[in-house]
Amino acid sequence: MTDIESALAHRLENHQIPHMEFPTTRASVHTLENGLTVLLDPDPQAPVISTQAWVETGSIHEGRFLGAGISHLLEHMVFKGTERYDGQAISDTVQAAGGEWNAYTTFDRTVYYIDGPAESVETFLSVLTEMVFKPSFPAEEFEKEKNVIRREIDMGMDDPDDRNGRLLYSTAYSIDARSQPVIGHMDLFNQLTREDMQKYHRERYTTENTF
């Protein structure tokens, strides 16, 4: 062992690793009569809230649509309107209540969230409930949103990191649904219809599948 290595070993041996402090949680789990699971984790010191809806629906659940990216397409279309709000009204309602919103789709889940002042919790929950369980899927927005995603797919194919990621997952999970990209393959994506999406929503976006 060299002098440098000896000195480094000595320093590491005597280095005190600080104890990590984790905040205590008051989280509780409740199941409603309709099967919806509700998780509450209050923090009275923070006057803000994060309202979220986690749907157990991602690319690995797509079954006959595997590789088409229907979960991701559905995530986009949910923002386009509900039985109660049109797309602009959703945005205006959230912003007027001081909220910021977004969503994402992964292999095993789709998550929608609105963050903002705690006093707006009822508004946020109302909007989230409408979006997740009562989307209207306006026909005039369907092809528009498909074109948005087509551009996303093209951009991904032009990105070396994205292509490497696809290659990694397709190799590591060659016999698993994770081998398929969440956003989908262009040829399969192009075949998706509005009716496909509506049926997929009815099958997957249930209260028992959401928390």
PLM feature spans:
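Charge-rich, well-structured scaffold segments of protease-associated domains
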Residues: 1-13, 25-26, 31, 39-42, ...
